[in-house]
Amino acid sequence: MKKRKNSKYAAWLEQEEFNNQIANAWILLGMAEFHKGDFLGSVSTFNYIARHYAYDPDVVAQCQLWIVRAYAEMGWYYEAEDVLSKVQVDNLSRKHAPLYSSVSADLLIKTKRYREAIPFVKIALPNESKHGNRPRFQYVLAQLYQLNDERELARHAYNKVLKMQPSNEMDFNARLNIAELESSPQDAIKLLKKMVRLDKHKDQLDQIYGTIGNVYLAQKDTVNALENYEQGIAESTQQGSAKAKILITAGDIYYEQRNYIKASPCYKEAAQIL
């Protein structure tokens, strides 16, 4: 009888489910719906779990955070912020606490509050898997610094990305951004020419030469700019937007120079790609 008078024991006794693995199974279902793009379905599932396991504050907080993510993906930012404001962070277990930081960062980035997002990304980053999301979070941090014009911090963060053995695409974009952050055009071109020699970037040569061309163009050096644009067009292995951009930029320069014979085929090929 003494046990029944204990409030914690009474709450435990009144719960509907005594197997905590069932809650995990439900959460996995909600996550699966989210990752399949069924955001409303996942919101419904997480709301059900939160009601069913109202006695478990960690489960409730987890569900609320996934609801925030789903609302944010649908662009329902007011609803997302409303739910986020109700999350009791102290109720999250140590294992799930980083989820609050990553969800907060995601919402702040989606609502273009980049500076506010930085501390949350920095908190979430060390808790991500080294071979999973950590390189991606490090890359996002670098982008946020770059968006806030913190060039040195951005360059340092991008260099950290390169040490994390990221995907080929992320490696390429990080190197490209490092080059673009160089204050000296000569140093930027030197870094970009190093990228040309890396075999793993052979399918992105159009982007690299295009960026070199842009550096020269910013210096009003149209001769070297066109030389690199033409090289990028010749080396392109994919009929994608990168090649189309170079063709249009080269076409614009030729047009301004009244070299219509060279401008016309550039525009024509770009139109076929787009």
Mark where each language-model region is.
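Acidic, polar-rich low-complexity tracts and alpha-helical solenoid repeat scaffolds
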Residues: 1-274
